[in-house]
Amino acid sequence: MVFDKLLEQAGINLEFEDKEIKDSDYLGDVSDLIKIAVIGVGGSGNNTISRLYDLGVQGADLIAMNTDAQHLHQIKAHKKLLLGKSITHGKGSGGDPRIGYRAAEASASEIADIVKDYDLIFLTAGMGNGTGTGATPVIARIIKETARNNGLPQEPLVISVVTFPFKMEGKVRIEKAKAGIEMLLEYSDTVIIIQNDKLIELVPKLPIQVAFRFADEIIARMVKGIVETIKLPSMVNIDYADIYSVMKGGGPALIGIGESDSNNRAVDAVMEALNNKMLDIEFGSGDKALVHFTVGPDVSLEEITKAMEIVYERLGEKSEIKWGAMIEEDMGKTVRAMVIMTGVRSPQILGNINVNALTYSSSSLVVPRDSKIMSESKVDEIFSSIDPRASKLRKGNNSSRINKIFKDLGFYEL
């Protein structure tokens, strides 16, 4: 099975060992150079934070934000913030994104105080419910505004990683997710959307609740790989400037994850990560890529070099490619490859849209941010158009641009 190692590390069929994070584990002066935070918003985002804590990710502060006090209390994190105490009284958003949005706005000063010192911030959430959908775009906006208000020479890089609902979860939740993604596009440098139904195609025999854990594992491993390759001594390091050059203004991006323990493991892992079943992707000379390998102690640099030749072949010799590799003892004979590619083009994408291309990997859809900041009136328009009690969802002239994008792709047609 292609993802045996990832499933094992997720604690699926095998118990994983919790690893407590201690301040002494950090790398002192080196860690102080680039400050990184991972903020989980809402129930799904909070679960990812707990998983990262269990994994023992080093070099990033893990922060949980939620409107549900009971769930927040159970989460393992370095910092926690109960959003909108005066609005929800710690009882959650009831699945309403407008409540999540207002709760984050009510906690704006507390959020600004938490995020003010970071250079790179990952936001993770599940789209389609209340807090993650409504609060995450507000938090992303506050991150950017705080940097501007403090006169920082460079805004922090904001990378949002969100899940898109299973089709079986229904049209209302899907519609909420689309609206949340539309808002998030305005405030993030890159938005990575992990389509739950695509994950099920990778591991079709998993029970539904275990599938949610697998989605958490995909996000956690991706974030952990990027953070620790920046922050820790690695076989081959990737620095913050590399991440910034790929994720800031890189245009449409493609993310894929693959792993293999075959005789040709590094090449096979990269091929799996590059595999794209949904769109006919064209790679041009202007493309950029970030490639990260997680390997066992017996993997040679020659193996990885051969795998990188595949990436150069697919993207072209003139492409700018950043890559790194980290050794993890528990990988054994398995090699995992994570590939982030920007500047990809697809002839199947339609529409004259500024953020004009979405593209799939075997598990993910990535959208670059529009440089324009959405107005408050637009925010109100989006959320006021969503009402779970209404018998008719947004149609016709009220359809958002994200609806058109998803319809053009045949993602889900409502």
From Swiss-Prot:
Q: Does the keyword Ubl conjugation apply?
A: no
Which residues make up the binding site for GTP? G130, T131, G132, E169, R173, D216
User: Which subcellular locations apply to this protein?
Assistant: Cytoplasm
> Pfam families, from UniProt?
FtsZ_C (PF12327), Tubulin (PF00091)
Per the similarity annotation, which family is this?
Belongs to the FtsZ family.
Quote the InterPro entries the UniProt record gives: Cell_div_FtsZ, Cell_div_FtsZ_CS, FtsZ/CetZ, FtsZ_C, Tub_FtsZ_C, Tubulin/FtsZ_2-layer-sand-dom, Tubulin/FtsZ_GTPase_sf, Tubulin_FtsZ_GTPase
Q: Which UniProt keywords apply?
A: Cell cycle, Cell division, Cytoplasm, GTP-binding, Nucleotide-binding, Septation
Q: Which GO terms describe its biological process?
A: FtsZ-dependent cytokinesis; protein polymerization
What PROSITE patterns does the entry give? Answer: FTSZ_1 (PS01134), FTSZ_2 (PS01135)
**A GO-annotated cellular component:** cytoplasm
One function term, GO molecular function aspect: GTPase activity
Record-linked CDD domains: FtsZ_type1
- What is the species of this protein? Pyrococcus horikoshii (strain ATCC 700860 / DSM 12428 / JCM 9974 / NBRC 100139 / OT-3)
The name of this protein is Cell division protein FtsZ 2
**Self-association or partners: how does it assemble?**
Homodimer. Polymerizes to form a dynamic ring structure in a strictly GTP-dependent manner. Interacts directly with several other division proteins.
* Function in brief: Essential cell division protein that forms a contractile ring structure (Z ring) at the future cell division site. The regulation of the ring assembly controls the timing and the location of cell division. One of the functions of the FtsZ ring is to recruit other cell division proteins to the septum to produce a new cell wall between the dividing cells. Binds GTP and shows GTPase activity.
